[in-house]
């Protein structure tokens, strides 16, 4: 895998070409001070409130959200949330233009590993505060910032990256309708159920139709239109049978191979013994979770306990412990005022 392949999978690189097959999205350049804030290490504390203008139908998940502030300064008496007025306006305008709720991501990754920290246990965001909370809690987002080329073989200097905030119109996607597709030398060689921890009866019953429809979509719209010969793309097949392009990913270890192994994929799956799902060598191998497989825990469960909390419990970071105690004291003061 080369650095150029990673760069080609940035959302802003492929979306203009394939936008008519994808979910409506807005791309906003990420200011350097916002990037610095997102990378600033510390303990999450509550310091203010923010309203989301433009949410015409507000539900329990679209309410006033707490802004966030991180601090490592034990002498800080009053904690105030950072302000990015111009950026905040652009983000809120984009959220409103997309219907009031969005799914956020960076150039490559979304904060899927941080969904648990949101009040609604969802990646659905209605304010910039929602986005900050997810991004600052996500190892995936941190990886985009700090190690985007970690698995690349070429030793050339890392190219300069212009980071972007991607806001995608919020859609209620059914996990059992998401699939990951693996392309080698511009040939679709493998398709995997995205949510491999669950068994979905409709996938087993419709496997041939699913495989053929994905292959047709690839041949008509993706093949030879992406700048690399080897890549991975994710799709969603809706209830009407329409296929939506969700994302592109590099062909390599940085991308989860799901029900395949990278060793198999690099062999083009042609000589994989006993692969009953690849009887026709002209068709991609389609793997899905069968009924006999025990339901597995979510792969994101391991991200549910932030290192900051571990540091607090073990006393390894005294400054964070002081911030945590200050937060509790402030909450008690607020309760007594009420």
Curated annotation (Swiss-Prot):
Question: Which residues are recorded as binding Mg(2+)?
Answer: 247, 249
Function, as annotated: ATP-dependent protein-folding chaperone for the eIF2 complex. Binds to the gamma subunit of the eIF2 complex which allows the subunit to assemble with the alpha and beta subunits.
InterPro entries associated with the record = CDC123
Molecular functions per Gene Ontology: ATP binding; magnesium ion binding; protein folding chaperone
Q: Where in the cell is it found?
A: Cytoplasm
Q: Which Pfam families does UniProt cross-reference here?
A: D123 (PF07065)
Naming one, the record's GO cellular component terms include: cytoplasm
Name this protein carries in UniProt: Translation initiation factor eIF2 assembly protein
Name the gene that codes for it: cdc123
GO annotation, biological process? eukaryotic translation initiation factor 2 complex assembly
Which residues hold ATP? Answer: 105, 108, 110, 112, 168-171, 178, 180, 194, 234, 247, 249
Q: Which UniProt keywords apply?
A: ATP-binding, Chaperone, Cytoplasm, Magnesium, Metal-binding, Nucleotide-binding
Provide the family line. Answer: Belongs to the CDC123 family.
